[in-house]
């Protein structure tokens, strides 16, 4: 059996492939590290969902007064309860 002779082209490809492997592993490590940091600091993060955030709005100097006689939404048990009580009177 003859000894295997490695061609120069294969040597260059191997070194390029090893270089590409190092670059890809560095990229994966960077993404993993950033993900870990972002997840561990998730309580401080508020996602931007194209709506105004209440935490960013200034406090209202004249907030609306609470309703003295709240009304139940139609179709809820509390709404039908009020109708039956009025009918019984």
UniProtKB/Swiss-Prot annotation:
Biased composition (Pro residues): 58-67
Lineage top rank: taxon: Bacteria
Region span, Disordered: 47-89
Low complexity bias locations: 68-79
Record's protein name: Uncharacterized protein 2 in cox locus
